[in-house]
Amino acid sequence: MWKTIFVNLFSFTILTVSANAELWWRSGTKDNPSYFSKAGITVSPTTDLTPYSNYATPDGENYFVLDQNITVQMFRSLWQSSNQHISMTDGSVLTIDTAPNGKDGYFSTIALRGIESFGQNSMIFESGTVNIVNSARDTYNMSADIRLNENSSGANNKILTFESGTTLNSELSLFFFGANNSEYPERSVVNLNGALNTSVSTDGVVKYNSITLKGDDNNSIIVNFGETATANIGKTNIEKNSVLNIAKGANVSVNTKNSGIASENPNIQVDTNAVLNVNGNLKISATASTHAMNINGTVNVGKDASVYIKDGGYRNVQVFRGGTFDISSTGKDSVYVDDGFRLIGGKLVLRSEEALASTIIWLYSNGGTSTIDLYAAAHAKAFSFTDGSKLVVNFNEGGSLWLDEFTVERGDNGWANNLDEKAMLTLVNYSNYLLHVDSFRAEDDLSRIFAEGFEEGSFRWEADTVNGGYWLVGTAVPEPAAVASVLGAFAFALAAYRRLK
């Protein structure tokens, strides 16, 4: 039978909790926090430990100090509106072990249970180490849930924070659950300002377990890596309506080597209506035959950010129909995608000049028409077209495109190559001298380039006598007024000729 035990840790009682039980740990104030050791309590790994907010605290701020190592089955707040501050002293470690659940599956490890009528419910780990483990991993296949969605039918906010002095280690895959109402997308927030590590070592082989931001039509969660955060994690899934933010100064490494993820899978998946905002540093180290990123939602790369994809796997980014990859980072090769961007009906937005300087842009046909929006004098390595691919390039104010090569051949059998009769390039808001190449291939069929205001089949390369290389230029279609003027002059001349006869 499950039991609930309420403990006032100022009472100096001696208590052993050895059966399945929920232990309520009553709070203290900032000047007089509640120390776990004062009660002389020992707990079994089957215990749920619950910081309990004491309404006697005048400001709603509740303080707990864990000053001994303990292992519990779950750590969760009650339903009050309060801020619960948890710190650990003398190297104390909180271990959350899912093994007592005794079966395969997904199990709550940290949970915020506040209900709507109590407003905000937050838990703040200010220092120390939290380990999430499965001590019976040879017997049970388990994953760990971090839940901010319990008792959350309304608009109450739930915030879980790990400050810069904390470390969260998980030997299990982590699932972050937000509140079950996407009308309030910012009310379920996890702030990770310290270290997050999901590695596990087996016989000397290290692998990193996955993290997933759970979301759907009715659920959403925001996970923030703060400016002091470091993360070493495995496959990362950002599901619908969820947001992952990487702040300036944060360092996030996604490593799927030894992870066993299936071939052709991505290392980072951004679903429809999901968002990844990168303002810090993101590095992806992939296992063989996997894609670095699959984008069905939105990725924004800020001006101080870097994205580095060079180590293992296919080393590419795939942007599908409905997906957008928006780049503002200013450093040369600050978005380094070793094996290129694949536009499969998706959109690439370039707001900086050199971020993609060494990257090839592949065009695929199976996603429909792909798009590039230019807002700067953007530099990339080359295009590579596949049969049936269509690309629209929008030249917005200040936008131009500079390529090392117009096209390159990709693959052993040349399945992606030059612009030919099976592909199409459309230029929007184009003027002559906005597309520059250092070199081009004779095989490129420039008659497959179309732009409003230019005669079809008129595009050609013109030598750039200042910078070297070549400009793409075409013959403009005469303006209607000019055409009318020419016709008028012709008619006048014809009439004069007839009079002379």
Regions found by a protein language model. Name each.
Residues M1-F6, Y497:
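Bacterial N-terminal signal peptides that target proteins for export
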Residues V7-T16:
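Bacterial N-terminal signal peptides
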Residues V43, D48-M74, S87-T89, T95-T98, ...:
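Glycine-rich repeat segments that build the extracellular carbohydrate-interaction surface of secreted
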Residues E61-N62, Q68-I70, R76, S82-Q84, ...:
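The right-handed parallel beta-helix/beta-solenoid scaffold, focusing on the short coil/turn
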Residues E479-Y497:
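A short, hydrophobic C-terminal helix/tail in secreted or cell-surface proteins
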Residues R499-K501:
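Membrane-interface capping segments at transmembrane-helix boundaries
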